[in-house]
Structure formats: C-alpha cells, structure tokens
Amino acid sequence: MTNNTMLISLSTQPADARWGEKATLSVNEQGFTIHVGTTSLNGKAALATIQRAARKIDGQGIKHVTLAGEGWDLANSWAFWQGYRGPKGQRTVEWAELNDADKKELNDRLKIVDWVRDTINLPAEDLGPEQLATRAVDLLCDVACDAVNYRITKGEDLREQNYAGLYTVGRGSERQPVLLALDYNPTGNPDAPVFACLVGKGITFDTGGYSLKPSGSMDSMKSDMGGAATLTGALALAASRGLQQRVKLYLCCADNMVSGNAFRLGDIIRYRNGKTVEVMNTDAEGRLVLADGLIDASEQNPQWIIDCATLTGAAKMALGNDYHALFSFDDELVAALQESAKEENEPFWRLPLEEFHRSHLPSSFADLNNIASGAHTAGASTAAAFLSHFVKNYQQGWLHIDCSATYRKGAVDQWATGATGLGVRTLANLLLSNAK
C-alpha cells in the first residue's frame, strides 16, 4: 500500500448523524467508510449500496484506493469496481486478499468485462465492422487460443455466399460488412456436437439509413454493437471458467449508413432459408443482419441458440436501461437464464412473445415486413417474432435478448456514462451450469 492511496472500508453500522440521515459514506483520517445500511455485508441491497458509494468516490476525483478491512469478498469487490470505473481516466485499486479461485475470477472479470465496456465505448471512427470482428478474435484467442478457429467473410463475398441481410444493410458504407464465424471447440474433436450458438448484432454505427435517426437518437449509436460485444465477453468468460462444450459464435457486423448505394424502403431481401422480407424501415436493420446469423446457427443443430442485440427502442421504453429484455417460447430455457441472472446479480426481465406475434409482420410483396403493421404496437415483441422466422426450431432452445441495459447515455447513481458490461456474467454462467 502506498501513502497516496485512499482507504475504503465497509460497515454494517449506520453513519454518524452529522453525515446526514441514511448516509452511505463517512470520512475519517483513515479514509472512507461505506455504510451498507443492512445488518449484513452480503446481499443485493449491500451490493447496490457499495456500487453507489463507489460512484460517489470516483465523482470526487479519487483515483487510487485500497479496499481495507473485513467484508471485501469477490462480490463486494466487484460491486465497488462496477461503480468506481469510468469511461475516461485511470483508476487504481489495491484489492483485499482473496482466495486463489476468487482472485482468478476477479482478474478474469477485470480483463473480459472491461474489454466489453471499452469496446462498446469506442468511437465508431475507431471501430468498424472488421475491427470489431478482429477484436473479438483477439480476445478469445488470448483466453483460449488452442480451442479457437474462425472465419471472417466480408464485402462482396457475403453477397456471393447469399448473406443477403448483412450485405444489404452494410453495402451503403465504405467500410465493408463482415461476418465472424468463430468455433470454440475445447474437445479437439472436429465432429463434436455444437452445444450452443451465439448470434450477436454488431452494428458499429447506426444512422438509421434512409429512415434517418434524429441527432438525439443517433448520438449513442456507436453502442449498437453491444450485443456482439456482450456475447463475445460471455464466451470468453465461460472459457476462462473452464467451459468444455463446443460453442459457435456468429457476429453480424456492419455500418448502417446513407449513401447512393444504401438500401431503400421497398427493397426486398431474399434469404437463404427461402424467406423474403420487404424493407419498410431501414432503421430496423438489426433484425435483418441477425437473420443471416440465425440461419447459420440453425444449420448447426445446437441445443441452444442465443442471440443478443440492442434491437429496439420499445424494450428501453418498457424497461429503461435497468434490465435486459428476454424473449423465448421455451419456458425451461428462460428459467435457466433467470436462475443464472439471480446467481450473478444481473438484471433480466421477460417480455411477451406469443405465436400470434409472428403474424404481425404482413407484407403485400414478400413473406414478411421488417416492421410490424401500424395496428400492432408491441415493437419489442414483434421484433423478436421476426427473428423467430429464421430459427428452424424456434419453439425450443432459442433465446432472444434485447439488451437494453448495455449502455447509458448519462451517468446515474450506480453507473458512469457509457457501457455497463451487464449480461456477460449471466450468459457465461448459463453456458457453464447448463452444458451437459
């Protein structure tokens, strides 16, 4: 411990009255004390208090701290870091002593979840479709290189191989669209069955296309690749925890731009599974690129297909930035994810998805419209329903996550502005605890 570090301790005792009613922070000559407001240093309420207190400490410009005294287990240490970390500037934490397993887990989270947050926070100028794909490869090779093989398909090769949705959305940008197909196979057996396929939306900037977003909706669209980053992090964390099952990762990466070559309203996309889609809103592009990844995933016949995307504003209207929205026809898979989310203390909430939602996308010229008709306003549910048309066995083993808790446009009491990394640990846990 150095002399210029601030000590941070935990207490179940209330703060002295001079610090204010229900104060969560007090100061003495040794440093800060976080008063968790409960009789235990463990539990959901204590974790939230620690995270909020860490945000306040960072807000005071304190960039070097030492976690001192009792109570700094893995969960509390991680809660502190989630609140303390910000998108700019360096912060140094001297951690309390942990056992070897918890120390490894903490270090893996610091590496992988912080990679997710940093990647989502990158400006679009620095992160195009191909850069996103190569960053994902670099992370997974760093974690488990011997188990990783991958293929990157881009530009005209996508068109020639009939990746119609991804090519159509990405063709309007000078930066070529890219599909990353990564095979994590720790068994070493090329004939091993695929346990799960992960399909991520990787729109590295979304103008909305000709259905142009206003500035207030476009200013955070560097984060529209949050689903791809989250799934990459989840697979990396699961691998670091010892995942022994084969998993394939598909990242559908593109810019959605306006240009003379960009796709237009009224265009019809013809997919490899025989479905045709009429484009009536170019700002509903995420589902168009995911469709290609879901077709590939279905061809692998995995037990599970999990897609993750910053897909709709409707999910954010329902849940804010506080929960990821969860959709599935498979109640058992939903229950498994919710149990994993509870164990990792991460927020997921199930929203409706019923068979009738699949009929809410009529088109006069194609099998499907890429947006629901005006009479059907359940935007998040109909977006999920659209995706179901590209999953062969959509009623079983398929999970769609509309990841509305990925990014915050402004700071709140628990989070700095920017990416949160929420969902990475839950999905890693799900892959591990339910792989047979």
Curated annotation (Swiss-Prot):
Q: Where does Mn(2+) 2 bind?
A: K201, D206, D224, E285
Which cofactors, if any, are listed as required?
Mn(2+)
Reaction catalysed by this enzyme:
Release of an N-terminal amino acid, Xaa, from a peptide or arylamide. Xaa is preferably Glu or Asp but may be other amino acids, including Leu, Met, His, Cys and Gln
Residues of the active site are K213, R287
Q: Per the UniProt record, which residue ranges are transmembrane?
A: none
UniProt cofactor note: Binds 2 manganese ions per subunit.
Q: Name one GO molecular function term.
A: metalloaminopeptidase activity
User: Binding of Mn(2+) 1: at which residues?
Assistant: D206, D283, E285
| Biological-process GO terms, alphabetical | proteolysis
EC assignment: 3.4.11.23
Domain of life of the organism encoding this protein:
Bacteria
Which is a Gene Ontology cellular component entry for this protein? cytoplasm
List the InterPro entries hit by this protein, alphabetically.
Leucine_aapep/pepB (IPR011356), M17_PepB-like_N (IPR047620), Pept_M17_PepB (IPR008330), Peptidase_M17_C (IPR000819)
Which principal EC class is assigned to this enzyme? hydrolase
Q: Where in the cell is it found?
A: Cytoplasm
Note the Gene3D superfamilies from the entry. Zn peptidases (3.40.630.10)
Q: Which UniProt keywords apply?
A: Aminopeptidase, Cytoplasm, Hydrolase, Manganese, Metal-binding, Protease
PROSITE patterns, from UniProt?
A: CYTOSOL_AP
Family annotation (NCBIfam families): PRK05015.1 (NF003450)
Q: Give the protein family.
A: Belongs to the peptidase M17 family.
What does the subunit comment say? Homohexamer.
Described function: Probably plays an important role in intracellular peptide degradation.
What protein is this chain from? Answer: Peptidase B
**Could you tell me which species this protein originates from?**
Pectobacterium atrosepticum (strain SCRI 1043 / ATCC BAA-672) (Erwinia carotovora subsp. atroseptica)
